[in-house]
Amino acid sequence: EAESLIPFAAIATVGDVMDLTDENRILVREGLRRLQNTDNPGLKALIRVNNLENREITAYHIGFILGPCLNASGRLSTAKRALNLLLCREEREAALLAQDLKALNDSRKDMTAKGVEEAVDLVENTDLGKDRVLVIYLPHCHESLAGIIAGRIRERYTRPAFVLTDGEEGVKGSGRSIEAYHMFRELVKCRELLTKFGGHPMAAGLSLPRENVEAFRRLLNENCPL
């Protein structure tokens, strides 16, 4: 029975961007082989709705097609929707659940693209573009997409980027960094402006009062070692 879980372990390993070395590599290789001919109604339906039937499923398909569909429910709704698909035993119900997750992921992609477009517009057409550390406030952005958008902005401008959005209490956000900028260390220098924060050299999450957003942007750039 444990062997039946190998495809799920492979999806989790690739979806969490784990290194594909040692036992991870073996697990993913075997999981992909089993995924190709899975008898799990939920996985079969998800493969079908993404037009991957009769195709060799690779780590790419998990990382960029199947995984994001499963992940979208946790970002925009509740992860229970993905769990319900994986536990489903009826093909007709599985087909409906899979279509629902794909639609949710398509919505996530559209929302992300809109957020990136708004962020780029602010960088290109305001004084933000002069900053070495980009702090972009998108009040209407879904908070679960802030990190994805920050990553896209970081890639586009090769600068550390924070994307902030309105949360239930104040402003919440995520940051994505570059090798030369220790993001967590720089947040420590701004801790008096923040409600809470956490992270590591390349990424961080934070919350702060709305009235501190501009001061946070200024202080990050004043302290910036780049």
Regions found by a protein language model. Give the residues of each.
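Hydrophobic helix-and-loop "lid/oligomerization" segment in the mid-to-C-terminal part
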Residues: 2-211, 215-218
